[in-house]
Amino acid sequence: MKIKQKLVGKTELKVDILGLGCAPLGGNFVDLTYENGAKIIKTALQAGMSYFDTAAWYGFGRSERLVGDCLRHKKYVLSSTAGRILKPGAVQNPLDFGMIDPIPFNVMYDYYYDGIMLS
């Protein structure tokens, strides 16, 4: 199946009009295993999808890790947030943030130039 694509602004970059939002793959309000998350990404790729959205906030990096592992050596377009930097150290109550099983990082917000470039 070929997903329709559109050009991004005045660039030559083409992006699918439908993408996979990967917040649940980070365990945001969902208890999802790494293996099941990988199956979701594999199924999306087999369906012809090449646009994925992830962020440091999703499982405090868990989604980014899974997406990176699954898309390595593939052709894709990735979107993410900026200004959220992962720092080592687990949060005390991850459920307060809607995280079921995050990896042991905490998010620091930095919307200045250096923080945007780091994220």
Task: List each language-model region with its residue ranges.
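N-terminal binding-site loop/beta-alpha segment at the start of enzyme catalytic domains
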Residues: 1-80, 84-86
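Glycine/proline-rich, positively charged
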Residues: 91-119
